[in-house]
C-alpha cells in the first residue's frame, strides 16, 4: 500500500517520514525525485516555489515498487499522486509560525503558509481530488493527523495508528482564537 504524506510546508512531513524510514518503511521524497528526474519545470521566484512536472512524478509513483507495506510518498503535493491513502499532517498555526521563522522564511512566505494551514488547503485539495467532485462527506482515504506538540517518534506513531485504524483527527483552526490571532498578524504581507 502506498500512502501519501502531505501538508503545508513546515508541518513536519520530512521529519515524520524520516522517523518512518527509521522504523523500516520505504519513503520517497518527491521534491528530491523531481530534482533527480529533472522534473522541475520552472521556479516561481515571486512565491519562492518550484513548479514540478506532476505527470512525470505520477508515473514515477505508479511504477515505484516499494519493499515495505505500507510505503510512504512525501511532499506538499503528494495528495495529487496515485496512492491508496492520503495522510494530511496538520500543525497549529502558532507552532508553524515558529518553525517557519526558524527556517528563515520571509514574512510573505510565512503568511502564505500560515493562511494555507489555517484554512486547510492541503486537506481541501486532497478531499477534492479523492471525492471526484462529490462533497457529501470527506472520502475515507483522506485522513488528517494533528502533529502539534508531538515528538518526531510520537508523530510517526500517530501516522501509523491513523493508517491502521483509518481514522485521524478533526482539525479546525478556523474556530481557534490563538490560530486566528497568529494568522491575522501576517495579513499585511498578503
Swiss-Prot record:
Enzymatic class: transferase
Single GO BP term: rRNA processing
Record keywords: ATP-binding, Kinase, Nucleotide-binding, Ribosome biogenesis, rRNA processing, Transferase
Enzyme Commission number(s): 2.7.4.3
Residue stretches spanning the membrane: none
InterPro entries: Adenyl_kinase_AK6 (IPR020618), P-loop_NTPase (IPR027417)
Reaction catalyzed: AMP + ATP = 2 ADP; ATP + H2O = ADP + phosphate + H(+)
Claim: Nucleotide-binding is one of the keywords in the record: yes
Region (NMP) location: 29-52
Stretch list, region LID: 102-112
One Gene Ontology MF term: adenylate kinase activity
Stated family: Belongs to the adenylate kinase family. AK6 subfamily.
Assembly and interaction partners: Interacts with uS11. Not a structural component of 40S pre-ribosomes, but transiently interacts with them by binding to uS11.
Stated name of the protein: Putative adenylate kinase
Organism, scientific name: Methanopyrus kandleri (strain AV19 / DSM 6324 / JCM 9639 / NBRC 100938)
Lineage: Archaea, Methanobacteriati, Methanobacteriota, Methanomada group, Methanopyri
